[in-house]
A protein has these predicted regions:
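Intrinsically disordered or highly flexible coil/loop and linker segments, enriched in small
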Residues: 25, 75, 104-112, 121-125, ...
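Conserved small/polar residues in nucleotide/adenosyl-binding loops
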Residues: 356-358
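Active-site-adjacent bridging/hinge elements
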Residues: 266, 328-345
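General structural signal for secondary-structure boundaries
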Residues: 171-177, 276, 280, 284, ...
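Amphipathic interfacial helices
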Residues: 331, 349-352
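Catalytic nucleotidyl-transfer cores of nucleotide-processing enzymes
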Residues: 239-327
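Hydrophobic, often aromatic-rich secondary-structure segments at membrane interfaces
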Residues: 303, 322-323, 335, 342, ...
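Extended, helix-rich architectural segments
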Residues: 1-233, 237-243, 247-249, 321-324, ...
């Protein structure tokens, strides 16, 4: 009898829903930070897109993050393996040669670059270190990938993800592709698993995506104590259907990974208590960016007021308003005598120089 079936998966989905609710604020902050990064932050501070006022977006915050990313790229770490004792010297030398080759093969420089962009924006980056069984024509090898924190779910209130009883990573997979990968999962009834993004928060992108043709595939990691030893177990499922379970795999009798640790590593910028995620430079600098742009908005609005003069016109004035408003007209007709009370310029006072200097 299978140890992991529909009942266990349904309970896991209930746990996933609780974990998602626990990190809802973090997910919204990450999505909002991406808008600030793309200089589309006016909508994030409550301004409607139909507002006719100027909405300048200076790149002060953007340039600050770009400079910090350049500093990080100038200091890419390299593995240095040192022996703990004399008998380890030969192994340390071998690892010193092997690890750089693995990192180069995994494209670590790009992973490091992308991870630092994410870390600067959101305060944390997450790296997945897993075993890829398809690498080297099926021989398998270590794989390193960046994981989007929007897709990762852990127990609310813990600071180290290793303390979480369960860990979920959710990916969206096209239904047809899923059927090609696991034909026994859906069978002929390809619509039997509901589509859509129930658990994953979405970025506000320019692309129009159809998530109804995608389904959520969940990587579920959890820990069990067997014979006094903690073991890491793994289950991949879609809907309430099990794709793979390490508990039902005889080759994983000692656990999915022998080190019994989750394959996700969090790297935090500014630490927060009660969560494995930190906060980033956008969280610190967004108010300063907002003040810069709001002051620029005031200056631009006042510049328009100063350059485009407005006038008071008496209701029964002799001035032809249509001709007066049309700057192409060289002549403006009036009926009768034109007095000073018929039309008067609305004076706009110059801005205080202290605002300009700020």
């Amino acid at each position: 009898m299978k140890k992991i079936g529909k009942e266990q998966v349904r309970k896991a989905r209930q746990t996933l829903a609780k974990y998602k609710e626990g990190k809802a604020v973090l997910d919204k902050r990450i999505v909002s930070n991406e808008q600030w990064w793309k200089l589309r932050h006016w909508g994030e501070i409550g301004y409607d897109k139909d507002d006719t006022r100027p909405m300048p977006a200076s790149a002060w915050l953007f340039n600050s993050l770009a400079n910090k990313h350049a500093d990080a790229m100038d200091n890419i770490p390299e593995p240095a393996v040192l022996p703990r004792e004399k008998s380890d010297e030969e192994v340390a030398k071998q690892l010193s040669l092997i690890l750089p080759a693995i990192l180069e093969r995994c494209g670590y420089e790009k992973l490091y670059s992308d991870g630092w962009w994410y870390k600067l924006k959101n305060g944390s980056m997450c790296t997945a270190v897993v075993w890829d069984p398809d690498a080297d024509d099926g021989m398998g090898d270590i794989a390193i990938r960046n994981a989007d924190i929007l897709n990762l779910f852990w127990e609310p209130g813990i600071k180290d993800i290793e303390e979480s009883a369960n860990l979920f990573y959710v990916t969206l997979v096209d239904r047809e592709r899923l059927n090609l990968m696991y034909p026994e999962l859906l069978g002929e009834d390809t619509e039997s698993v509901a589509g859509g993004t129930e658990n994953v928060e979405k970025y506000k992108t320019e692309d129009k995506t159809d998530d109804s043709v995608k389904v959520e595939v969940v990587d579920w990691y959890y820990k069990k104590t067997i014979n006094g030893r903690k073991q890491l177990c793994y289950c991949k499922f879609c809907g309430d259907r099990v794709i793979y379970s390490s508990e039902d795999d005889e080759s994983c009798a000692d656990g999915f990974y022998k080190h019994s640790r989750y394959p996700f590593v969090m790297d935090t910028l500014f630490v927060q208590e009660g969560t494995p995620c930190g906060f980033g430079y956008i969280d610190v600098m967004r108010d300063a960016q907002m003040y810069i742009d709001k002051l620029s908005q005031v200056v631009l609005e006042h510049t328009v007021m100063m350059s485009r003069k407005r006038y008071f016109i008496r209701q029964n004035s002799a001035v032809n308003e249509a001709e007066f408003a049309d700057l192409k007209n060289r002549f403006v007709h009036v009926a009768g005598n034109l007095g000073e009370e018929d039309i008067r310029e609305i004076k706009a006072e110059p801005l205080d120089l202290s605002l300009i200097h700020i």
